[in-house]
Amino acid sequence: MATSSSAWLIFSDHYREILIAIACLVVFSLLRSARSSSKGGLPYNWPIFGMLPAIISNNQFNDFTTARLRKMGWTFIFKGPWLLDMDYIFTCDPSNINHMFNDNFENYPKGELGKVFDIFGNNIFNADGDLWHDHRKMAQTILWDGNYRTMQATFIRNKMDNALIPILDSAACKRNPVDLQDVLLRFTFDTSCFSVLAADPESLTMEFPPVPFSKAADQALDAALTRHITPRLIWKLKRFFNVGSERTLAVAWKVIDSYIYDKIAELKAKRKLVGKINSYDAVSFYMDNFNIHDDKFLRDNAFTYLLAQRNTQSLTMTWLFYALFENPKVELKILSELKSIVDESSERKFNDGFALFDSNMIQSAIYLHATLCEALRIYPPVPFEIKDAHKADVLPSGHKVRAGEKILFSPYAMARMKGIWGDDCLEFKPERWITGNGTLKHEPAYKFFAFSAGPRICLGKELSFTQMKMVVATIIYNFHLQMVKGHVVEQSNSILMDMKHGLMVQVRKRSVM
């Protein structure tokens, strides 16, 4: 009996050693294959988990994706975990983007992806088909209305005069560093609230008060990103049990709804008290011009307008100033152009020694416009987007698309491909946007994707350019900004191209008048 037990122990020890040896061999082989695969361009396709671990473990998604797309000829297949329907086609090929947004537009609706962004409700962002066409017609009427544009330009000028300039002036006098990203986010939140809800939340003040809506909106977008990289079954279970990111989203959703519904109620109460008022904000426009008074409809569209204006404009301007810190010669060229405009303008706007640029003055600022284009090219506020294929298809790159398959395309990566933007694609070079005749150079939207492309191209493109030029021109002409020494600029892993640590700057007043 003892002999039998000893033999079994010896056998067990040998058996255990054999299993450990086999396990080590398997792990070693997988790691070697993973390294080999990585060198070849693709993330390693693990058993069961697919390529998802490579995405989850990487804290710079945009650069990670760019490197793979560069090695794989602008398009590759991303294999997700088994049985979870998470396979994607990653691409930055302009011909593929043109195909999805122009040539075969109807085959790539919002579809199932609208459920990922359900917090937006039923509006132009999530809608398809006839509903989308109706939303777009109404949005076009609002955004292209002369009174709406004049109201916005006037409010922006006043906000620069009464908030932006005093805060930067105070920072210069006290030599206190400020987070420029936070300043610009607050500025665009105030201006967007006024243009959408006829309300000024006054978030941009010397006190820098908490802004619950902005925090909630950022949390909602982060939750949407989590849904993108999480199996659908998992995030739906999290939503059902109200845990993790879905719990955060639910709380944020309540904050967002509370703010917007309250502002809609205030606007309606004011109109009921004094009768119809000459207000050209978006919500009033829906009520007056389209006879739409449904709170849910107004809430959904208001939320879309607020995020579109607040986030994209502020982040574009933030990255533009970062690019100027890295390329001071570009700033000098902009300043020279602005001096010429001020000298030639018959509409000089000065207050307490500061110049204010209005929408008329900056129309001739070609180099400033080109600089904004270059910032949008290299630092697109929405660095990637995702599409669903309604039916099976074949992309111009030759990749087959299954019905229901997702395609992730990266404007961020596209800007960094020599075959698309030339050997100098990594340089911040506004001159690429100016022709030999000194006029602005046009690039097709499927190559310069900052404002989308095809039938869904942004209706507020020119309005957005005008507003950003007013703000950037006013800041550059009156102040010289420098990034705080030692400050680290890093992208957040987010749906939007924001800076993880903000953009801390020192402010100094100029003497250029």
From Swiss-Prot:
Keywords: Alkaloid metabolism, Heme, Iron, Membrane, Metal-binding, Monooxygenase, Oxidoreductase, Transmembrane, Transmembrane helix
Gene designation: Cyp96T1
Record-given protein name: Noroxomaritidine synthase 1
Pathway this chain belongs to: Alkaloid biosynthesis
Catalysis: reaction(s): 4'-O-methylnorbelladine + reduced [NADPH--hemoprotein reductase] + O2 = (10bR,4aS)-noroxomaritidine + oxidized [NADPH--hemoprotein reductase] + 2 H2O + H(+); 4'-O-methylnorbelladine + reduced [NADPH--hemoprotein reductase] + O2 = (10bS,4aR)-noroxomaritidine + oxidized [NADPH--hemoprotein reductase] + 2 H2O + H(+)
Highest taxon, organism lineage: Eukaryota
InterPro entries: Cyt_P450 (IPR001128), Cyt_P450_CS (IPR017972), Cyt_P450_E_grp-I (IPR002401), Cyt_P450_sf (IPR036396)
Enzyme Commission number, as recorded: 1.14.19.50
GO molecular function, one term: iron ion binding
PANTHER family membership: CYTOCHROME P450
Positions contributing to heme binding: C458
